[in-house]
Amino acid sequence: MKTKAPMKNIRNFSIIAHIDHGKSTLADCLISECNAISNREMKSQVMDTMDIEKERGITIKAQSVRLNYTFKGEDYVLNLIDTPGHVDFSYEVSRSLCSCEGALLVVDATQGVEAQTIANTYIALDNHLEILPVINKIDLPNANVLEVKQDIEDTIGIDCSNTNEVSAKARLGIKDLLEKIITTIPAPSGDFNAPLKALIYDSWFDNYLGALALVRIMDGSINTEQEILVMGTGKKHGVLGLYYPNPLKKIPTKSLECGEIGIVSLGLKSVTDIAVGDTLTDAKNPTSKPIEGFMPAKPFVFAGLYPIETDRFEDLREALLKLQLNDCALNFEPESSVALGFGFRVGFLGLLHMEVIKERLEREFGLNLIATAPTVVYEVHLTDNSIKYVQNPSELPPENCIACIKEPFVRATIITPSEFLGNLMQLLNNKRGIQEKMEYLNQSRVMLTYSLPSNEIVMDFYDKLKSCTKGYASFDYEPIENREANLVKLDVRVAGDVVDALSIIIDKNKAYEKGRALVETMKELIPRQLFEVAIQASVGNKIIARETIKSVGKNVTAKCYGGDITRKRKLLEKQKEGKKRMKAIGKVELPQEAFLAILKID
């Protein structure tokens, strides 16, 4: 395999696309056309390495591959960085785009521009990337290339006169696209003679080599005999190995030079030692300052994860630690619940990230888990002028100690067919949304910009959005600020005891409605006991809704045939006393469905 090329013959590019617009299939075509993987080893979605990615048809972990291509008698190196398309994984997108000079903007010829595409394109434009529009799926009978071109120009403001029209599935236009990448996307810039400056834009854990860093060399070069300084930690490490990325196998090399992308092995045991966005430099001749403008991924949603078999707490800890080796955005800390025992409070990027992590824990580690209702971080101002950050409803201080509560807001961008506009605006109003902007992209599509409380979108917003627009709307958001809100803690009491795992922080105006729905749902789910069970929803000490599960009746008078009525009365009174005693000491086992029900109640 050819390995080295002058910097003028290197092209670093990424692929920006909304979920399901054919990005992974296009990546497969480019890999196949450049013969980076033999036909025998080639399979669909070769860049997607997790089973969950293939099953759901999504990209979660950004991958990279080095391609060699000959154009007009010259050898070129094309470094392709595949990126996720879902809003939860936008941190993967931003780090990948920082290491490129260009990006392919892939748009489905049947669907047009979607909200996530716009968000990622703006990240690329902020990083001064050359954008190359690519219209995919042109072979489909309902493809409308002219309308999509106009859509891209109107929505993003990119000239589409030289747009590439391709079909990744039918392999149409792939050769022309490769040539356009070479002629349009600029070569990397950098000083070969300057001290080493390398940006870590991804890291993961390898069972044999330890923590590996995927880097873009901005200045200078790195070789296997160098000692490296990780600028964020101030620690020095020897280089154990350098590799070029390939989805199936790493290709060893003795050096990585300015403009190149490669994998660095420093023999480290955790990805926390090589944080994404950190800078590698030469320990003996370091660069003056690290690469700027990189933010670590912050969790957006928090939920409790508890093992159903309580003796598997340590297994859950081990499993989370193993997943954290590959996922710097995942963080967790132990917590305990009266109802569920010992578990962990886990921070996620969003609901899809939470679903994927829970599914991987259950599938790869054989755990059975209960997840509590997802929540966000609230800023609680106390009467003594101190501030407390609360991510678990059970940690909320008593009402008389709180001066005010601020909740995080997001700016949401939603693109929808205009026929669903009324339904969508009603949903956004129900979710306490504030309209900022409404813009018609063309006669049939509208772009809405709303500010929304984060709390309202972490429950079931995405499902309801798809439901009220028949799946046609696309959605993207970015965090903006914390705003004061009228929030209260809604508790659920079963047989007089507060079930801490079911507590939620909610807008005061919605508390009664939610509490009513919650107790009615739980009445259906909790099995009848030998004693009467009261299910109550409360705010502070005030009960706002109640349902009662009647006791299972045993006919104690069945053996009394006729005779004195006092005999029957005596047996019934004895039963009544027994039930009263049982009610005082009896415990109610809550089924798992009760914890899942809270997620589905609007």
UniProtKB/Swiss-Prot annotation:
Location within or outside the cell: Cell inner membrane
GO CC terms: plasma membrane
General function of this protein: Required for accurate and efficient protein synthesis under certain stress conditions. May act as a fidelity factor of the translation reaction, by catalyzing a one-codon backward translocation of tRNAs on improperly translocated ribosomes. Back-translocation proceeds from a post-translocation (POST) complex to a pre-translocation (PRE) complex, thus giving elongation factor G a second chance to translocate the tRNAs correctly. Binds to ribosomes in a GTP-dependent manner.
Family: Belongs to the TRAFAC class translation factor GTPase superfamily. Classic translation factor GTPase family. LepA subfamily.
Gene3D superfamilies associated with the record: 3.30.70.240, Elongation factor 4, C-terminal domain, Elongation Factor G (Translational Gtpase), domain 3, P-loop containing nucleotide triphosphate hydrolases, Translation factors
Catalytic activity: GTP + H2O = GDP + phosphate + H(+)
Disulfide links within the chain: none
EC top class named in words: hydrolase
Molecular function GO labels: GTP binding; GTPase activity; ribosome binding; translation elongation factor activity
Recorded name of the encoding gene: lepA
Name this polypeptide is given: Elongation factor 4
Coiled-coil regions, chain positions: none
PROSITE patterns xrefs: G_TR_1, G_TR_2
Keywords, sorted A to Z: Cell inner membrane, Cell membrane, GTP-binding, Hydrolase, Membrane, Nucleotide-binding, Protein biosynthesis
Protein's GO biological process: positive regulation of translation
InterPro entries: EF-4, EFG_III/V, EFG_V-like, EFTu-like_2, G_TR_CS, LepA_C_sf, LepA_CTD, LepA_IV
EC numbers: 3.6.5.n1
Residues annotated as binding GTP: 20-25, 136-139
Domain tr-type G: 8-189
Membrane topology, record value: Peripheral membrane protein
HAMAP family noted in UniProt: LepA
